[in-house]
Design a protein with these regions (language model features):
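Short "lid" loop at the C-terminus of a central beta-strand within the Rossmann-like core
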Residues: 16, 33-34, 60-66, 104
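A short SAM/SAH-binding and catalytic strip from SAM-dependent methyltransferases
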Residues: 24-39
Length: 128
């Protein structure tokens, strides 16, 4: 009696193939460490894929992680801030819910990892 049969999982590279517009309740970009232009393309494509009420979640290694955190890519060109993600969303109709820097404990390490986290939602009743 689960809901698994109601879920359609899609694993795809939104930087290469745009998902169908207005089809998804959730778009997740987890540790999508791309150069700024490619990240913007991927974030906007994921945003366009959301139905009304749909949620976009973007989480990845923050640029500060390079000098003050631990782990993650050691290339500043693929690290980002929450503000950079929200700038990519400025041309969309998504409503920002959360945009912040998050410190994440890492086992057996004295420093935290530093992540950028953004959540935004397409308003109900909107299809563009």
């Amino acid at each position: 009696l689960g809901v698994g049969h109601l879920i359609r999982w899609v694993e795809a590279d939104v930087a290469v193939t745009a998902p169908d517009p207005h089809e998804y309740d959730l778009a997740l970009g987890a540790y999508l460490q791309l150069p700024a232009g490619q990240l913007g393309t991927a974030v906007r494509a994921a945003a366009a894929a959301l139905r009304p009420g749909g949620l976009l979640v973007v989480v990845g290694h923050h640029v500060d992680n390079l000098t003050a955190g631990v782990g993650g890519p050691q290339d500043a060109a693929v690290l980002f801030t929450p503000e950079e993600v929200t700038d990519h969303l400025a041309s969309t109709d998504l409503v920002l819910e959360r945009a912040e820097t998050v410190r994440r404990p890492v086992p057996d390490v004295t420093r935290n990892a530093i992540d950028a986290l953004v959540t935004a939602r397409r308003p109900m009743g909107l299809r563009a």
